[in-house]
Amino acid sequence: QDGQHCIAEEHDIVYREDPAPGAPAPVAQPAPEGSDFSRSIHPDPVLLFRYSALTFNGHRIHYDAPYARDVEGYDGLVVHGPLLAQHLMLLAEEVGGALRSFAFRASSPLMHFETATFCRNGEDLWVRGPDGRQCMSATAEFA
């Protein structure tokens, strides 16, 4: 903006091997108990399709339910990690003000039929799935 560097973004993306046939599913960690503030959304296929279009994300796990189930092995459409992170970032800004930095890590996929609860406790943020598992964690540093 006016020749000034305003935002720096870094991505560390880890792609894992497919699990061996018959291997047990990883155990999801429980989300922290208690929060200063929380709110929930109910993602649906239309939201995921629109977000895919907006972000030019062509991965079919976000908009093609038969593919997500039958080929990738998910229970339904997968909610985008960056969509969850954006909701956490908005929650942080609404409660704490302008951000200096924001970092997040996805830990368990959230399906389109699951309620996502966005929680904040100070600078710590997380997404809780309907079964109490932690789907994402984040930290916010305020300006």
Q: Locations of the language-model features?
A:
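HotDog/MaoC-like acyl-thioester-processing domains
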Residues: Q1-P43, P109-F113, C119-A143
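Catalytic strand-loop segment that frames the active site of acyl-thioester-processing enzymes
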Residues: H11-V79, E93
